[in-house]
């Protein structure tokens, strides 16, 4: 390690959960649906890798304790699913009857269509494995969002 300092580098992909910023796709969609509004979305064909925030914190902790100095680790769930599936799971956790505006927004010219972390090295070096299924994490995130709505 240069200068006697160990370091690891985290490449954090898409993390969601309580305390997320209001302008992320997940947070904005939750807020629209909780308000009974139809969110305007792309068709949702992008394949995406979402990781619950508590799992991301666990990955970072494990990197600090067990990571190889100088290593670069991708932090994600390691699994990509169509964005449409995440959005439908989110909606279903709020109210199955709410409409989704899938396809109302066109893809941008720079739209990323596939994002997935390769967590092979992270798992091998640190023992990290995501523990929270998206459906469970999104329910916790929605519960938190409801408390924010009541306090604002």
Each model region followed by its residue ranges:
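C-terminal substrate-binding subdomain of Rossmann-fold SDR/epimerase-dehydratase oxidoreductases
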Residues: 27, 33-152
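Conserved beta-loop-beta element that borders a ligand/cofactor-binding pocket
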Residues: 1-18
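Short beta-loop-alpha junction of Rossmann-like oxidoreductase domains
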Residues: 18-24
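Non-catalytic, surface-exposed connector residues within folded enzymatic/regulatory domains
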Residues: 6-9, 23, 84
